[in-house]
């Protein structure tokens, strides 16, 4: 006989406590501890195996290396982020803001997957008629797609066991409920238990399962943090509502590389792949304008060029204002301090703004030099050449430090018509002779050297 006990669980991080806290000891958030009733098995009750059959032990040397079989989604950018396709028996979590396109990309993938595989689409948010309307708009006409409007996890798991579909899509995990848990749908306990059941089902029958997840106000997957540890792959769908572009980013992948991205454009017909993101990021760049510089960052194995815009104006307040969009604010403040101390460019009476065009977020330190160039270009009202690109990490001593994949970055710049590349001095030796002949490559050691190497006109 199961006993009932109450626990207070944080809705943000999943921290559990026997008493209520105003501030969660785990994540520090306020008013996130919610009371939930848990079922606990009484002492002496035989613990079930959870549906797992005991298996004989195997030595590592006895295990054969089977080539993993991947299933292509038919969307090249999607396959890139997944590591080459869908792995059998994997559990993939896809998160993103409401209306960003999570359900859209999965439904579009069903059109190609349905040519050779059967797909079960489980919806807890929409009716079958609503899904049909959206499928018609996206041009999804496959007969291998089956719709199930259900939220009970036990019923869904039984359907998977009996029907044996090749691929399962759960939309969304926050609407699923497990009848052995008394809390409401979307609670920490419900999300955790439902995910465990889907993981068990995926591994037992070798069926890949996609799980759609909502995000909280901070942009993280809503529910316990352990949710991301349970699944095999975590994908984030990012994008600003004011932009038509969407970025699919992989942050965890047990079967491929992480930090890969796929770029899409949202249209009336659905999501379209952007095969050349660099060209898209640089489209519409102003001519002969100060305060703009092109950066080259690595997103996984792909070099991407992005325009960084800086604006420096006289402040109207006692304390200068700093604002950054698409670039870390604290790192921007550090770069301004380095420019003042090491290069003699003073911003103490100036407001400074940084914007990365097209909604891209630059997390790599290699973007430091481009951000610094954009700020100084605006400060001095000097125009950086249209065909000039710069990348490199800036240290606190004002030095330009080496970055990885330098040759790939320079090759991408040359392919898009750039003529001059300002790069870290320590990366220059690793470049091939052909690249050095094709492009005007300027190696620099310090911030001062970088600005003196620029061709600018005031």
What is each PLM-predicted segment?
Residues 97, 124:
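P-loop (Walker A) phosphate-binding loop of NTP-binding proteins
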Residues 119-123:
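Conserved RecA-like ASCE P-loop NTPase motor core of nucleic-acid helicases/translocases
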Residues 128:
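Divalent metal-dependent catalytic cores for phosphoryl transfer on phosphate-bearing substrates
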């Amino acid at each position: 006989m199961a006993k009932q006990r109450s626990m207070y669980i944080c809705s943000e991080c999943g921290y559990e406590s026997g008493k209520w806290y105003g501030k969660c000891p785990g994540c520090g958030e306020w008013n996130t501890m919610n009371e939930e009733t848990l079922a606990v098995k009484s002492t002496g009750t035989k613990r079930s195996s959870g549906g797992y059959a005991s298996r004989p032990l195997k030595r590592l040397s006895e295990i054969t290396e089977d080539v993993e079989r991947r299933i292509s989604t038919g969307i090249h950018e999607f396959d890139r982020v997944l590591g080459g396709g869908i792995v059998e028996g994997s559990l993939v979590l896809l998160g993103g803001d409401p209306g960003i396109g999570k359900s859209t990309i999965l439904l579009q993938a069903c059109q190609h997957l349905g040519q050779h595989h059967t797909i079960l689409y489980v919806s807890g948010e929409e009716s079958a008629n609503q899904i049909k309307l959206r499928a018609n708009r996206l041009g999804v006409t496959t007969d291998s797609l089956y719709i199930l409007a259900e939220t009970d996890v036990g019923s869904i798991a039984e359907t998977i066991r009996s029907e044996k579909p090749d691929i399962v899509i759960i939309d969304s995990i926050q609407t699923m409920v497990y009848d052995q848990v008394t809390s409401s749908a979307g609670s920490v306990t419900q999300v955790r238990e439902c995910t465990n059941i889907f993981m068990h089902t995926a591994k037992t029958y070798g069926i890949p399962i996609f799980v759609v997840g909502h995000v909280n106000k901070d942009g993280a997957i809503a529910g316990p943090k352990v949710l991301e540890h349970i699944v095999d792959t975590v994908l984030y769908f990012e994008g600003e509502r004011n932009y038509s572009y969407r970025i699919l980013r992989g942050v965890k992948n047990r079967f491929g590389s992480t930090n890969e991205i796929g770029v899409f454009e949202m249209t009336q017909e659905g999501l379209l792949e952007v095969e050349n993101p660099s060209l898209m990021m640089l489209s519409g760049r102003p001519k002969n304008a100060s305060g703009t510089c092109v950066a080259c960052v690595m997103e996984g194995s792909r070099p991407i060029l992005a325009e960084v815009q800086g604006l420096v104006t006289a402040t109207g307040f006692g304390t200068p204002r700093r604002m950054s969009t698409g670039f870390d604010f604290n790192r921007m403040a550090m770069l301004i301090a380095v420019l003042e101390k090491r290069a003699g460019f003073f911003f103490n009476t100036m407001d400074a703004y940084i914007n990365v065009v097209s909604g891209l977020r630059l997390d790599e330190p290699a973007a430091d030099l481009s951000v610094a160039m954009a700020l100084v270009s605006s400060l001095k009202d000097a125009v950086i050449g249209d065909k000039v690109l710069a990348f490199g990490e800036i240290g606190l001593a004002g030095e330009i430090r080496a970055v990885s994949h330098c040759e790939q970055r320079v090759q991408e710049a040359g392919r898009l018509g750039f003529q001059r590349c300002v790069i870290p001095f320590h990366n220059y030796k690793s470049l091939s002779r052909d690249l050095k002949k094709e492009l005007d490559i300027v190696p620099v050691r310090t911030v001062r050297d970088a600005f003196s190497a620029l061709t600018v006109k005031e």
